[in-house]
């Protein structure tokens, strides 16, 4: 007996972990955020540039989020000429390549901004995605501390433009040279210790999340993600002895206390700088760092930014090794609860710093640079939970229904009239047999109104008429069951017959009545 043919199995529709689909309301909120940030950046004189999502892996260089293998930490593949190509993991390394490639034609200093998605080949988790959006601004070709101070001021202005009031955010500033001075003192200076130094920096970068004890484990043998032996994944530490790690832990612990408590000084920020000078005394690199911090403090204060907006915080290090001087982070100070009622502290939503060696790799000459990046995806999640973003579904288009199959051309003409007046409109393209289904479709599209014209309206003795149904008002009728008089009045308003010639005016009246604006 012949075997029965096997049924073809349906392909399961699913997404890889760490990725998410996004609908119209979320995309509209992203667009509004991006335009707000763009306006701030352009007010500071920055101009747009766009680089591709892919770069040669060697252009990203040794500064990949993870080390050793080209596809560790980033998504990579080999091209047909066997060269490794990677998806960008940030927007800074591609900018460095772009500037180096177009160096002679660009004005210096070169001030640019760009936004787009970046990609991380990392273990996904709550709030950790493999694709997310960033919005960067960078100044290439200036070694002046004024360029760093400007990044901090622009970050503060961007937060306030997005509706985050003063006191609800802070721009925290430090200098990697200060920490480099500490690491020099424990024998971790020089190129030969670059790998261990990067591990130390990544450990310190987790201070907000893991606390001093968690960082202590990562400076030593390592840490189990579950918090106990054998629980979760194991992260290998920097393998520092307790004696070697003590100066770093003291720096962090004392630095946090100084940053938290009011310093006995007329100027709190310069008081912290003075404290850091004592920690790195004897280190030329550390002394350079404290001098640059003092210059930034004076510049931002002169521009009117007090320590409630921009302040020194010795715990800020940033995780990537390409930073060479001042580093900064924007932290939200607001607490809220997630959809399950659990407390949420958002922490850092942006950061950056000076990276004087990144462009120089391509040029063989010093090219100073500094930049700042806003994590748009992370910040949007925070603003949504805080109720700072309008996440309601956007108004859909006006829907022109099809009452008579043989008059589709007439209905298309109505759609064209509306579009010519800059009104979003569409012709119903499904099966026109059931008018009820057409109205349900318009409801699902969140349409403000629908247009109906049957043969009776078309051949009206007083001239061609149309029926305009106000769907917003119609939805309100359900709550008016007890007030019959108001119900009947609104019912009459929700469906009006008007001359076809008044199509545009009637639709505009309804849009204005319900404050419908398409962004």
Swiss-Prot record:
It comes from the Bacteria. Gene3D superfamilies: Anticodon-binding domain (3.40.50.800), Bira Bifunctional Protein, Domain 2 (3.30.930.10). Its main location: cytoplasm. InterPro entries: aa-tRNA-synth_II, aa-tRNA-synth_II/BPL/LPL, Anticodon-bd, Anticodon-bd_dom_sf, His-tRNA-ligase, HisRS-like_core, HisRS/HisZ. Keywords: Aminoacyl-tRNA synthetase, ATP-binding, Cytoplasm, Ligase, Nucleotide-binding, Protein biosynthesis. It is an enzyme of class 6 (ligase). Its EC number is 6.1.1.21. One of its GO terms (biological process) is histidyl-tRNA aminoacylation. Disulfide bonds: none annotated. Belongs to the class-II aminoacyl-tRNA synthetase family. PANTHER family: HISTIDINE--TRNA LIGASE, HISTIDYL-TRNA SYNTHETASE. Homodimer. This is Histidine--tRNA ligase. It comes from Rhodopseudomonas palustris (strain BisB18).
